[in-house]
Amino acid sequence: MRELFPLLLQGTLVTIGIAACSTVLAIVMAFVATAAKLARWAPLRWLGNAYVEIFRGTSLLVQLFWFFFVLPLPPFRIEMTPFTVAIVGLGLHYGAYGSEILRGALRSVPGAQFEAALALNLSPLTRMRRIILPQAMINALPPATNLMIELLKGTSLV
């Protein structure tokens, strides 16, 4: 057992590293995709919807295989290390799910809060930062925590 401890420790550190980096990428992608899906410009909305539908509609294992085996082929020629493939695959996959969590949380804020922010003549950025996002984040925290636990469990595929 003692000779296996260094290997277990190394595997644990790799898992934590992949999970931490993937979580950061997933959070960034969730915010970007949510902003795209809620945009007024139709092509941006379409792009956000396409990202979410593609990454939620295919399994994580298929996506990881695609990133690792298909991207290095001639039309793309994008080669990544296994560590990078794990981070990108997990981050993009769970970012799509996180986008739906954020979108639902933003939609859960009562319309009266938007109207009150408009009545106070707050700028759109101030409205979002001071009034809407704090309430939405309270609603998004439990499912987002579950999603990050799923991401940690998803590292077993890499």
Model-found features: residue ranges?
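Transmembrane alpha-helices and adjacent helix-loop boundaries
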Residues: M1-V158
